[in-house]
Amino acid sequence: HGIIDVKAIDADIVQTSPYKYYGPHCGAFYCKKEVGDSLKAARVMADDNTEMPFRMETGTMCMENASGAAEAVEFIADIGKRHAEMFEEETADLTGRRKDIVCGMLAMDTYEAQLADKLRNGIKDIKGLKLYGPCAGTPQTATVSFTVEGMNSNDIAKKLADRGIFVWDGEFYAIATIWE
């Protein structure tokens, strides 16, 4: 999850889900006009709107999700406004709302990285605990993965939850590897 500049990377199409950045579970779609004009879309008979971007909608849009997605972006931009001075160098060529959003993402990334580093440093020497991820000093996300010898991930999550620490213990969309 990161900052994308569709113009800088000359993206034809970008799809995302706002739940990745504090919004609801729904889809968001960017498409260059010339690419969109060449795409066919499924249509319902009662809908004769053939112009982009409306022809990509297959029915009534869920306004609650659209509102939630917009508010998620507003949430990020608000954080960016409050922390813009921290990222003047990185955002020198940006202005307005784009700058606010980028500063918000950078502020959250910075905060999450600090928390993850604190966690990694705090647990790395626990006997029987194996920490997974890139070597120190290499780029990494704020995701911290570990196992504890002799315990399954569900039991670890329950023990931590009993102490007010909440972690994910699922298969992270890789259930087949757990079955093997």
Role assignments for model-derived ranges:
Residues 1-180:
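Pyridoxal 5′-phosphate
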